[in-house]
Amino acid sequence: MSTNSNSKVFALADVNSMYASCEQVFRPDLRGKPVVVLSNNDGCVIAQSKEAKALLEIYMCRPWFELEQQAKKLGVVAFSSNYELYANMSNRFVATLKQFTPKLEVYSIDECFLDLTGMKWDLAAYGQEIKQTVKQWTGLPTAISSSIF
């Protein structure tokens, strides 16, 4: 999909399971494995990898004590939250995205809107290039979606 000169084009870049993905970046042995991240004081689940989602019926803020025994039996690895790490990885994510456009709006720790207005490239291919570069430079799996107005 390409754009014409009158189109406004925006993309959303969103890290998949940000906190769990950050933990997996620094523990390569856990890539593809079920991982959950717990709140302060390890009270409840605040993030989970797609592998953990497939194994457990976890909803946001579910108390960890309700899941701990079952999770251990299923090989789920739990991490205490590390907000300093997540902020650092978010900064790397944003810095990588800035290589693709100077017009960027940080929406949250794992989401940014990119203004791609005026791009002459195929948007699907450009989105793939962004995803691949983010993965290569940061290790974070990212979804990219775009809209033309």
Please annotate each region the language model reported.
Residues 121-126:
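Short, conserved charged micro-motifs
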Residues 1-113, 119, 130-138, 146-149:
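Residues that scaffold, gate, or flank divalent-cation-dependent active/transport sites
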